[in-house]
Amino acid sequence: MTDVVLTHMHMDHVGGLLVEGVKERLRPDLRIHVAAAEIKFWESPDFSRTSMPTGFPDAIRSTAKRFREEYQSQLRLFDDEQQVAPGVVVRRTGGHTPGHSVVRVASGGDRLTFAGDAVFA
């Protein structure tokens, strides 16, 4: 595996990368693609308009900080759109989170769009 695309940074999407021992099993040159807006949001998220259980916002911030610290050198941030590989493009759409992205895959005449958790926007 050479690339990972994160549609957003909720724990159910980044958590597997934070499991003890996982990073050591990944390629040192692994590229992790994520929208710059997503990183910016999780550095200082505004949860003032949401109702979350006590302590949950702090847990989210802590996870995002740990992810950024552990994978900083492997992050490939993009503003609007980035080609990950031939036929694979990631595009920031916002919605579910400020930097939520979709992945478009094209092969021959076939097309696929993976929308992450956009249904929960």
Q: For the regions a protein language model found, what residue spans apply to each?
A:
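Active-site metal-binding motif and surrounding structural segment of the metallo-beta-lactamase
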Residues: M1-H33
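Conserved beta-strand elements of the Class I
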Residues: T2-V5, V89, T113
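Active-site metal-binding loops of divalent metal-dependent hydrolases
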Residues: M9, A37-E38, G95-T97, G116-V119
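Active-site glycine- and acidic-residue-rich loops that bind
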Residues: H10-G15, V89-V102
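A short secondary-structure junction signal
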Residues: G16-V19, E43-F47, S101-V103
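A generic local structural motif
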Residues: L18-G21, S62-T63, R76-F78, H100-S101
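Metallo-beta-lactamase
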Residues: L26-R92
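Cap/insert and terminal regions of metallo-dependent hydrolase folds
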Residues: P98-A121
